[in-house]
UniProtKB/Swiss-Prot annotation:
Protein name (record): HBS1-like protein
Signal peptide: none
Segments for region (G5): 447-449
Known function: GTPase component of the Pelota-HBS1L complex, a complex that recognizes stalled ribosomes and triggers the No-Go Decay (NGD) pathway. The Pelota-HBS1L complex recognizes ribosomes stalled at the 3' end of an mRNA and engages stalled ribosomes by destabilizing mRNA in the mRNA channel. Following mRNA extraction from stalled ribosomes by the SKI complex, the Pelota-HBS1L complex promotes recruitment of ABCE1, which drives the disassembly of stalled ribosomes, followed by degradation of damaged mRNAs as part of the NGD pathway.
Ranges annotated as biased composition (Low complexity): 148-158
UniProt subcellular location: Cytoplasm
Gene: HBS1L
Positions where Phosphothreonine occurs in the chain: T233
Renumbered residue ranges of the record's region G1: 269-276
Organism classification: Eukaryota, Metazoa, Chordata, Craniata, Vertebrata
Region (G3): 346-349
Length: 686
């Protein structure tokens, strides 16, 4: 109880004798002299406030801004188009014009930026922008150090630069400013802007460059003259979101890569046919893999007990692929021939990784089919259950028309002509049935391990006595590149998404149509989100532009990485790609065991998208050659039939009609681990 007595009898008044007042000065008990106080005491009253008051936003203004969107019930695509138009108009007008006026102008002119700008700029509110610019120029003029009387004697026309002009015309609009040249006189320090003729369609704007030129008046005259001499030569406008220079893509494509044409090549074939070893040895012989790296691969493969896989490790970079000895994902690299720049894609051959193979084949222009010439190995890959047949059908269904068949491992059969002719006879008949022309298919005997007949014609007497054809590299160089869809709207299908070291994130994929420049605004579908292309990387090198056929990496800002998935398609906001869950298609049924009926579940493979789907309707059976309807509303579809069906996906998918975009109108249907049909989109429902 003593402890409780101590607590009850404790005198708390001793602890509260003096209050500690923090944050303000308390006078001491003794006085201090004024001089000492001025030297050591900080006076808050005499000093200006270091913290400026934060301007608070008016809730009513925000409410009015949000209500302007509510008043106009717009769809998701129209909202994206509206945001794109507002961004372009703000880049030109700045924040001088309220957003509600800009929105009304855009909606009245049906999302036409040219007409909307003309309407807004004709109003009186643009005059406020002109008044502010004149005040800024006059302020910079006083800073020159001249007397106020001499400044007022000059006429206002000599001080204020002429308002520059911006012309918006044509289908593609060029956002830019015409910068007036500023000249300085030694005596008067006056500015003169040469007069330029302008058309009636030109729209007046105060250029920010004109303000910068006026601020240069604080510099000496010889400095201004030196800057004029440097600016006398025309310099291209920097590629940015605000000022972007339009380029001639076709002319730039001819200049790029020394006049060499771009070709996308995919290597396909049955598992263990030697695809990675063949192309890895080809890259080593071309010098794309140095000797030091190759020696490292040889030593590491020997330690792992896979000495024959040394060249395959050039393309199989992951530890799991090297450990299993099987390619699992599409390996991509680049090499050059005499007339071509080849983007090489090494596709997996195992049946478990057919979806990855479809992704690589969908991005290819031509293909190399690798078959094993060993006894029993070719038959295992070519007969039922092998991947040689399925890969051949897949690449033909995905638009590949030119094919080189590399009959590999010919050294194991001592370069026998009989074995080569046996393989070419069986494969040639099958490829002709699959839709390949005989003139577009070439058979080449090779050896991936020894390097025979890869980049130079073989000198082996066992081969030269009966084969006089091209080597593999010469055959690849003789492929004809397809016609690129440069004039069509921009389309890029995302094959990978990753976080960049800097701001934003990166997506990789092949540009299927159109072209892109740094600073372009893009629309991602189906997420329906807009962003800006901050940077473009082609073959690990930064570039300012890229066109159809290029495999690029885009650095994007203004969007959350969570909203982008593999399979999303980037397009221009003005001409977006269509998004739907139901569409009609014409399909060709392959060799299937179970007939296709209404409600049949399938897996839709479209570019890099893999989406579950259901066949909702069987509309009609078509004639293979003429396309005429032979039977309406069939109850089932069997192998070899050509039919018109309606499919429905679980989630929205971005599609294009085959007649408009052949690259984006093809798809494959798989069921239970095998490909059952190939098709093209004929109608998009919703």
């Amino acid at each position: 109880m003593a402890r409780h007595r101590n607590v009850r009898g404790y005198n708390y008044d001793e602890d509260f004798e003096d209050d500690d007042l923090y944050g303000q000065s308390v006078e001491d008990d003794y006085c201090i002299s004024p001089s000492t106080a001025a030297q050591f005491i900080y006076s808050r009253r005499d000093k200006p406030s270091a913290v400026e008051p934060v301007e608070e936003y008016d809730y009513e203004d925000l409410k009015e801004f949000s209500s302007s969107f509510v008043n106009h019930q717009l769809s998701g695509i129209d909202q994206a188009r509206l945001y794109s138009c507002l961004d372009h108009m703000r880049e030109v007008l700045g924040d001088a014009v309220p957003d509600d006026i800009l929105i009304e102008a855009v909606l009245k002119n049906k999302f036409d930026v040219q007409k909307a700008l003309s309407v807004v700029l004709e109003q009186d509110k643009v005059q406020n922008l002109k008044v502010r610019s004149e005040g800024a120029i006059s302020t910079g003029k006083i800073a020159k150090g001249k007397s106020i009387d001499s400044q007022s004697s000059q006429s206002e026309s000599e001080i204020v630069p002429k308002v520059t002009k911006m012309t918006v015309s044509g289908k593609k609009q060029t956002m830019g400013f015409e910068v007036p040249r500023v000249t300085a006189e030694e005596n008067g320090h006056s500015f003169h802007t040469p007069q330029k003729g302008h058309s009636s369609e030109d729209t007046s704007l105060v250029s920010s460059d004109a303000l910068e030129s006026a601020s240069k008046s604080a510099l000496p005259s010889h400095t201004i003259q030196a800057s004029e001499e440097q600016s006398s030569t025309p310099t291209p406008v920097k590629k940015s979101g605000k000022l972007r220079q339009q380029i001639d893509i076709k002319a730039e494509l001819e200049k790029r890569q020394g006049g060499k044409q771009l070709l996308n090549l995919v290597v396909i074939g049955h598992v263990d046919a030697g695809k990675s070893t063949l192309m890895g040895h080809l890259l080593y012989l071309l010098g794309d893999v140095n000797k030091r790296t190759m020696h490292k691969y040889e030593q590491e493969s020997k330690k792992a007990g896979k000495a024959s896989f040394a060249y395959a490790w050039v393309l199989d970079e992951t530890g799991e692929e090297r450990e299993r000895g099987v390619t699992m994902d599409v390996g991509m690299t680049k090499f050059e021939t005499k007339t071509k720049v080849i983007t090489l894609m090494d596709a997996p051959g195992h049946k478990d990784f057919i979806p990855n193979m479809i992704t690589g084949a969908a991005q290819a222009d031509v293909a190399v089919l690798v078959v094993d010439a060993s006894r029993g190995e070719f038959e295992a890959g070519f007969e039922t259950g092998g991947q040689t047949r399925e890969h051949g059908l897949l690449v033909r269904s995905l638009g590949v028309t030119q094919l080189a068949v590399a009959v590999n491992k010919m050294d194991q059969v001592n370069w026998q002509q009989e074995r080569f002719q046996e393989i070419t006879g069986k494969l040639g008949h099958f490829l002709k049935q699959a839709g390949f022309k005989e003139s577009d298919v070439a058979f080449i005997p090779t050896s991936g391990l020894s390097g025979e007949n890869l980049i130079t014609r073989s000198q082996s007497s066992e081969l030269t006595k009966w084969y006089k054809g091209l080597c593999l590299l010469e055959q690849i160089d003789s492929f004809k590149p397809p016609q690129r869809s440069i004039d069509k709207p921009f389309r890029l299908c995302v094959s990978d998404v990753f976080k960049d070291q800097g701001s934003g994130f990166c997506v990789t994929g092949k540009i299927e149509a159109g072209y892109i420049q740094t600073g372009d605004r893009l629309l991602a579908m189906p997420p329906n989100e807009t962003c800006t292309a901050k940077g473009i990387t082609l073959h690990d090198e930064p570039v300012d532009w890229a066109a159809a056929g290029d495999h690029v990496s885009l650095t994007l800002v203004g969007m959350d990485i969570i909203k982008i998935n593999v399979g999303c398609i980037f397009c221009v906001p003005k001409e977006p790609i269509k998004v739907c869950t139901r569409f009609r298609a014409r399909i060709l049924i392959f060799n299937i065991e179970i007939p296709i009926t209404k409600g049949f579940p399938v897996l839709l493979h479209y570019q890099t998208v893999s989406e579950p789907a259901v066949i909702k309707r069987l509309i009609s059976v078509l004639n293979k050659s003429t396309g005429e309807v032979t039977k309406k509303k069939p109850k089932l579809l069997t192998k070899g039939q050509n039919a018109l069906v309606e499919l429905q996906t679980q989630r929205p998918v971005a599609l294009e009609l085959y007649k408009d975009f052949k690259e984006l109108g093809r798809f494959m249907l798989r069921y239970s681990g095998s490909t059952i049909a190939a098709g093209v989109v004929t109608e998009i429902k919703d």
